[in-house]
Amino acid sequence: IGIEVMREAVRVLETLEHKHALPLEFVMFDWGAEKYLREGVSLPPDALEMLRREFDAILIGALGDPRVPTNQHAVDILLGIRFGLDLYVNQRPVKLYDARLCPLKGRNELDLNFVIFRENTEGAYVGAGGMLRQGTDGEVAIQEDVNTRLGVERILVHAFEYARGRGLKKLCMSDKSNALAFGHGLWQRTFREVRERYLKIESRHLYVDALAMEMLRDPSQFEVIVTCNMFGDILSDLGAQLAGGLGLTPSANIHPGKT
């Protein structure tokens, strides 16, 4: 759906450009499945430096094509840009525009309006790990989950600053520290320290399984949610479905002050 989504997204931006006199300049690139299948190239060698030097924002449609079973082009583009430009904030607003789109019974537009902040450069998605005795009955697969104090603190601070800047009163941090004692223990300790800087915001913690249940039971209780990479990936898609589907829920990958 990438091409179709992009076509409509550009129409919206062009409307905003004319309505609000925004000085937008669009440059289109053919990066996607067609280019990958034709040339075997996902991103040109100088793509990241060119994007960093010449552009303020990057608009990407949905990536994926059954002709590329491994989705290698999508991995190269999304993760290449995300890690290459250190886009550590993934911001996923969840807003219901029409009650008929929500699968939950008796919910209306006022019940579903929150934002999920997902740490975007660490966790289980860094690609660290390996295989032992591959192809044997004793095969072992190891996938490492990497969390740093810098990475955890900066996404927590960004979420709190977002809440404060918009006059929001409630923030929920989610992890699984009862089972992932080391990595998510770091999330717990850092959260307790950072929340002391924002005492006017009602902040609380929920384990991710409890949070998923609460999002279904009463989504109106949430304003800002912040969590790790993998949990944010899952929860934001759950939120998207509550709002009517992925086609209605945008996603922004951000390095505040840069991209």
PLM region descriptions:
Residues 66-67, 178-182, 213-214:
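Short, small-residue-enriched loops and turns at beta-alpha junctions
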Residues 22-24, 53-57, 86-87, 109-113, ...:
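Short coil/turn connectors at secondary-structure junctions
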Residues 214-259:
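Glycine-rich phosphate/nucleotide-binding loop
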Residues 35-142, 230-232:
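N-terminal glycine-rich phosphate/adenylate-binding segment common to multiple enzyme folds
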Residues 99, 206-213:
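Short acidic loop-to-helix transition motifs that present clustered carboxylates
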Residues 19-45, 213-215:
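N-terminal beta-loop-helix "entrance" segment that forms/cooperates
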Residues 1-11, 15-19, 136-209, 221:
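Glycine-rich phosphate/diphosphate-binding loop of Rossmann-like nucleotide-binding domains
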